[in-house]
Amino acid sequence: MNAPDKTGTRRRAIPAAVDLDALIRAEHRDPFSILGPHGDGGSGQYVRAYLPAALSVRLLARDDGRELGEMEMSEVPGFFVGHLEHPQPYLLKINWAGGEQITEDPYSFGPLLGEMDLYLFAEGNHRDLSSCLGAQVTSVDGVDGVRFAVWAPNARRVSVVGSFNSWDGRRHPMRMRHPTGVWEIFVPRLQPGEVYKYEILGAHGILPLKSDPMALSTTLPPDTASKIAAPLQFEWNDQEWLQSRAGRHEVTAPLSIYELHAGSWQMEQVEDNQWRQYNWRELADRLIPYVKELGFTHIELMPIMEHPFGGSWGYQLLAQFAPTARYGSPEDFAFFVDACHRAEIGVILDWVPAHFPTDTHGLAQFDGTCLYEYADPKEGFHQDWNTLIYNLGRTEVHGFMLASALHWLKHYHIDGLRVDAVASMLYRDYSRNAGEWVTNRFGGRENLEAIDFLRHLNDVVALEAPGTMVIAEESTAWPGVSEPTQQGGLGFNYKWNMGWMHDSLQYMEEDPINRGHHHGKLSFSLVYAWSERFVLPISHDEVVHGKHSLIDKMPGDRWQKFANLRAYLSFMWTHPGKKLLFMGCEFGQWREWNHDRELDWYLMQYAEHVGVKNLVGDLNRLYREEKALHERDADPAGFQWLVGDDSANSVFAYLRWSNDGEPLLVVANMTPVPRLDYRLGAPMRGAWTELLNSDAETYAGSNFGNGGEVMTEAEPAHGMEDSLVLNLPPLAVLILKPKKD
């Protein structure tokens, strides 16, 4: 060991027995206090390393590789001690049974994370946490490697493990940074692509190996390891889109969203009954032209964050910062987003800050305690989904979820987040009986911590990612969901109009002969249509679990089902509010959605299905081109009833107005009986052009209508001096516009 011959020197070379015993048992709370370089009491240094299964270790000079001496193995197998005459950068030359390894000593590096990073994390306000915690490919003191950092404040010991250390938790125990509870270590010479997990010693022993909550990449399920990922290596080409995005997201702009599940939109058949999911690059080639043809302004992806169980559709996810490996690499996903933007299609992600699954490799009992979740099951266990609820009242968890949102918006150029299950976050008694929930500090049912989080989220997103959107799936009458936080609201850009969805679908499911008794189901939404900024959603939730597909909800024979569907979609596209339609509904898929199968594309050989698809394309085109259909969605003056009470005929008629005073007339006949000579007031005299007839032949309808154009008559109706006399096709919607000279 070449140690100086001084009294006590040998004693200082070997740690105290209690420390050595704790290290061997992998229970030492501060391995840096005994491993690595330490002063010898004079001008030199002892170097200690614990390398179980190593045969021998030599010290080399880092600058030129010359040999500095051999490290002696102590009485404890694997514990080596060497001596340096004076402090200097060194390398460890380790002889293993399988070969030789030369590396820097992980325990020769000082504290890694800056005090400001730790402070902001503890405060719950670190805006770029995905570049701080987790596995960061970096350089420390000129040495390339990976810095690991994980929050586990109640752990007795945390080690990073992987194939690089034979998954041996004794090899790389980490340093705890008090008082934040973050553990860190720099492992030299590690490369992107290596897999890893954390081995955590809790109060009651070693826990199941844990995936990294901050992982930027993962292995393909059912494997559960995290994967080291370099900073996103992608050259973006969407600057024009980003510059124009804020204008595209104004409440006066058209917003038409195509919701899809990336893995089951289309698949490739590789063998009989064997299907392969497309990766992001392949999906871009197929999906983007299709969405462009149909005229949607945005797509909305069901959660693409890594999730262990495919049957959860992504809503029970564990990697809030990593795209699932099912469809390729993080760079592949960036390519997909960039390609969408270059085609002028926005990308919205479903995002889940409400709950997470109980998988043992995940967040549950992460350090042996309820760290991310509430400790009391009355607060922390979601009975509907058998999941755990994020404790957003804890600043670190609050900041963790806030950083996840910003990660997708900033690193992946995502245009908006649709926040899942907001209602379950707002109420402590959500889906709970009396005695099964805990009140807030004021004795109420509101979840004050979640409310604070949602308001903070929306304020921070507006500041850090201007021009993006945050949309709430919120199913209750909570007031001010889309009101600014400064006015007491939650601050979302939009809220899903679940009331419209339920009422309108219930109306459409009625046999037309009975619809007159349920007339208000279709008109009631106009009572509150401007109480929030709404998105009208026909989402995946409406075409699963025995609810039937959208077309299969419709009553009648085959012809009537298609006519009802076309009328419903036309009503939806002319109703105030932005639009969202789930994949398959745009061509009338009969089968409920199944995440294990692609859509039934073979249906496109039938005229009725092609007709529905053509209608959706034309509705989107009109919706974008006609300002009256989108400009005043949030302004009640942009809508005017003409006929809302004709329950005997099940006819609805209304005007949509643009900011410059141009109207569109919408007339819906929700029975299979043609209505001849139906008189409606007209705000402008002259010819009115039939922009759309959902019964047109091009949509596989009966082609009953008005010949494309109608002249007003000098006959008062509905408070107007002139009127139109129209033939209303069966189960159909007409859209008319005054003809300009």
Curated annotation (Swiss-Prot):
The record's Gene Ontology cellular component field reads: cytosol
- Record key words, sorted: Carbohydrate metabolism, Glycogen biosynthesis, Glycogen metabolism, Glycosyltransferase, Transferase
Q: Which GO terms describe its biological process?
A: glycogen biosynthetic process
> What GO terms are given for molecular function?
1,4-alpha-glucan branching enzyme activity; cation binding; hydrolase activity, hydrolyzing O-glycosyl compounds
> Which CDD domains is this protein grouped with?
AmyAc_Glg_BE, E_set_GBE_prok_N
Which Pfam families does the record match to this protein? Alpha-amylase, Alpha-amylase_C, CBM_48, GlgB_N
Q: Write down the chemical reaction(s) this protein catalyses.
A: Transfers a segment of a (1->4)-alpha-D-glucan chain to a primary hydroxy group in a similar glucan chain
Q: In which pathway does it act?
A: Glycan biosynthesis; glycogen biosynthesis
Q: Does the record's keyword annotation contain Transmembrane helix? A: no
Q: Which residues form the active site?
A: 420, 473
Top enzyme class, one word, equals transferase
Cross-referenced InterPro entries: A-amylase/branching_C, Branching_enzy, GlgB, GlgB_N, GlgB_N_E_set_prok, Glyco_hydro_13_cat_dom, Glyco_hydro_13_N, Glyco_hydro_b
Q: According to the UniProt entry, what is the EC number of this protein?
A: 2.4.1.18
Partners and quaternary state?
A: Monomer.
The UniProt entry's sequence similarity note says: Belongs to the glycosyl hydrolase 13 family. GlgB subfamily.
Which PANTHER family does this one have? Answer: 1,4-ALPHA-GLUCAN-BRANCHING ENZYME
Q: What does this protein do?
A: Catalyzes the formation of the alpha-1,6-glucosidic linkages in glycogen by scission of a 1,4-alpha-linked oligosaccharide from growing alpha-1,4-glucan chains and the subsequent attachment of the oligosaccharide to the alpha-1,6 position.
- What is the name of the protein in this document? 1,4-alpha-glucan branching enzyme GlgB
Please name the source species: Pseudomonas syringae pv. syringae (strain B728a)
Q: What is the lineage of its organism?
A: Bacteria, Pseudomonadati, Pseudomonadota, Gammaproteobacteria, Pseudomonadales
